[in-house]
Regions:
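Membrane-embedded alpha-helical segments and the immediately adjacent membrane-proximal loops
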Residues: 1-281
Length: 281
């Protein structure tokens, strides 16, 4: 009879496989990668069959910009200067964030692969499952990630539905929001993917810290030197993560703050228009 623990492990790995496929469809990963619950991490070389999804995302981003230009009157025309500038910055910065994210994913393919390959090499060298952590520890990390992932999706879906069908329905803001949904969604997925790398790195660093604490108590100098090599590997992984996500995440965070600021202004404008009896376009 299958135990509850084995069911949780199986569901966690299958769910994580689906998440990896999702990140490939979005264009973040341009190489095949799988994490099996028994064989561990499998990483393939860069291939065009995987990169086709990156090309599709790039095409969608270009089409999104072209359609916004063609429908300029419906998106921006007739608004007050402050409202129009808000929409310009919000849409333009969001679209730029997507372009930079896709550029980082393409030009940083080998950097990206090196992150996962170093985790695999650490596991092979130390007889562990993923980096320095064993399978039960990895399952706990994945469960924590899935919880955060589902909460973010649920909150965003509720907010978007409320806005789309209630708050701005029938207004010009409603039309603009539909165009801004694509870069807005890609921005959130980039945050989530970065969060995954942070959680995995944190789990490995904690495991290294535990090893160092045990070895310091025993006073084993030779094994301390081995841990120094492991620390070097984790440092290289961290540097690769910073290189892969650095510029795109800086722009992504700026885009998120701009989104919040402009949305707060929009709410203020809506409240003022309701108070004065004006119709919000």
């Amino acid at each position: 009879m299958v135990s509850v623990e084995s069911m949780i492990v199986g569901v966690s790995f299958r769910a994580f496989s689906c998440v990896l496929v999702l990140f490939q469809l979005i264009g973040f990963m341009n190489f095949p990668i799988k994490l099996h619950q028994t064989t561990g991490l499998t990483i393939g070389d860069h291939r065009w069959s995987t990169s086709i999804w990156w090309i599709i995302q790039l095409a969608l981003t270009v089409i999104c910009g072209i359609m916004a230009k063609r429908n300029y009157d419906n998106l921006f025309n007739g608004l007050l200067l402050t409202d129009a500038m808000n929409n310009y910055f919000k849409f333009g910065l969001g679209l730029l964030t997507v372009f930079v994210t896709l550029a980082d994913s393409w030009f940083g393919i080998e950097t990206h692969r090196s992150i996962w390959m170093r985790y695999r090499d650490l596991a092979t060298r130390n007889g562990t499952f993923f980096g320095l952590i064993e399978r039960p520890q990895l399952v706990r990390v994945l469960i924590r990630f899935f919880f955060v992932f589902l909460v973010i999706i649920a909150v965003c879906a509720i907010v978007e539905r409320q806005f789309y069908y209630d708050i701005a329905y029938g207004s010009q803001w409603h039309y603009f929001w539909t165009y801004n949904l694509y870069p807005y969604t890609i921005s959130h997925f980039r945050h989530v993917y970065h969060l995954l790398h942070i959680l995995l790195m944190t789990a490995n660093v904690r495991q290294l810290q535990k090893r160092l604490s045990r070895l310091q108590q025993l006073g084993v100098a030779q094994q301390l030197e081995a841990c120094r090599v492991i620390y070097g590997q984790l440092w290289q992984i961290n540097e690769a993560i910073n290189e892969l996500f650095g510029f795109s995440q800086a722009l992504n965070i700026a885009c998120s703050f701009a989104q919040i600021a402009f949305d707060l202004y929009w709410i203020y404008a809506m409240l003022m228009s309701q108070d004065t009896g004006l119709k919000c376009k």
